[in-house]
Amino acid sequence: MATATVLEKANIGVFTNTKHDLWVADAKPTLEEVKNGQGLQPGEVTIEVRSTGICGSDVHFWHAGCIGPMIVTGDHILGHESAGQVVAVAPDVTSLKPGDRVAVEPNIICNACEPCLTGRYNGCENVQFLSTPPVDGLLRRYVNHPAIWCHKIGDMSYEDGALLEPLSVSLAGIERSGLRLGDPCLVTGAGPIGLITLLSARAAGASPIVITDIDEGRLEFAKSLVPDVRTYKVQIGLSAEQNAEGIINVFNDGQGSGPGALRPRIAMECTGVESSVASAIWSVKFGGKVFVIGVGKNEMTVPFMRLSTWEIDLQYQYRYCNTWPRAIRLVRNGVIDLKKLVTHRFLLEDAIKAFETAANPKTGAIKVQIMSSEDDVKAASAGQKI
């Protein structure tokens, strides 16, 4: 086992449970285990996690205790958007060395089932996805993980490295939706995934792009990211079809939504909310597509006959596969800039406050990052690379 860096701080993690408690406590592997290489399996490396983003699913596991069939059944560590430094490697690992900066792709697959063997490993029948019960997540100071799922990020900041996970979600959607250069595109929802999808759609050449949300502040934030994006504030009292008319009106510079009006070929649905999915369906052109990235309730009602008579494809996404190298290139080469998305930063020991901030709409939080040291928090907040 090769090691680097003087390790001094104990391992702690951010836990929830069936009672919806949230706390910070000692976590595995222990500091002594990390120093001595105990528990490091063949093919694994130990990572000192330096930055982790809070995902909406983390908040949902805390508040609701489940997402569909994925249920918290005991003490459970959250977090799956992380980057850090390799501090130890198993003897058989040759692709990484202590000191390497990496982003963690948070899955472990079986490499034996049909999805794995056909390259769609996000559908692995035996997947262990970090932070999805019962598999503990990355919100801890040290973690062991297979080297094959640790992607070198070079001189990229750990903060950007942690944002590669939500970017991968967006890239998977853009690719599978078939979005083309010059396509009119609708993005529903200006949360973190919607905003990253907006950046990705712009990079892919979509034009014009309209983004929707119920929060005017988030729409203003979207315009700060992509100044020429058009925005539509969803009206709560209107039907899905009526909101769609408003969306089409925005696509047409206020000239209405009647026959001949420009409609999006692709709608990237990033909320998972039934009314938003329905509005997207009512918005797209004949032969268009509604691509659902957002996670919603187990069952929902959609305008079936609109889908049928307008030949609209309704397509879904589950996580991602084979996206991380591309995501790294896009960020490293400046094609997609994610820095503005981070609005709040907290120390690992202050994770409860971080989660409260992420969960409260009044804070204006977009992406909340949790970092392993006070120096990292101060440096990142000052715009310095960590």
Curated annotation (Swiss-Prot):
GO BP annotations listed: L-arabinose catabolic process to xylulose 5-phosphate; sorbitol catabolic process
Summary of pH dependence: Optimum pH is 9.4. Active from pH 7 to pH 11.
Residues noted as binding Zn(2+) 2 in the record, renumbered to the chain: C110, C113, C116, C124
InterPro entries (alphabetical): ADH-like_C, ADH-like_N, ADH_Zn_CS, GroES-like_sf, NAD(P)-bd_dom_sf, SDH-like
Cofactor note: Binds 2 Zn(2+) ions per subunit.
SUPFAM superfamilies hit by this protein: GroES-like, NAD(P)-binding Rossmann-fold domains
Residues given in the record as Zn(2+) 1 binding sites: C55, H80, E81, E165
Effect the entry attributes to changing A359T: Alters cofactor specificity from NAD to NADP
Catalytic reaction annotation: L-arabinitol + NAD(+) = L-xylulose + NADH + H(+)
Function: Catalyzes the NAD-dependent oxidation of L-arabinitol to L-xylulose in the fungal L-arabinose catabolic pathway. L-arabinose catabolism is important for using plant material as a carbon source. Not active with NADP as cosubstrate.
Protein name: L-arabinitol 4-dehydrogenase
EC number(s) given by UniProt: 1.1.1.12
Class of this enzyme: oxidoreductase
Binding residues for NAD(+): P192, I193, D213, R218, I293, Q317, Y318, R319
Reported impact of Y318F: Increases affinity for D-sorbitol
One Pfam family of this chain: ADH_N
Pathway: Carbohydrate degradation; L-arabinose degradation via L-arabinitol; D-xylulose 5-phosphate from L-arabinose (fungal route): step 2/5
Keyword list, A-Z: Arabinose catabolism, Carbohydrate metabolism, Metal-binding, NAD, Oxidoreductase, Zinc
GO terms, molecular function: L-arabinitol 4-dehydrogenase activity; L-iditol 2-dehydrogenase (NAD+) activity; zinc ion binding
Domain of life: Eukaryota
Oligomer and partners: Homotetramer.
Required cofactor(s): Zn(2+)
Gene responsible for this protein: ladA
Assigned protein family: Belongs to the zinc-containing alcohol dehydrogenase family.
Temperature dependence comment: Optimum temperature is 40-50 degrees Celsius.
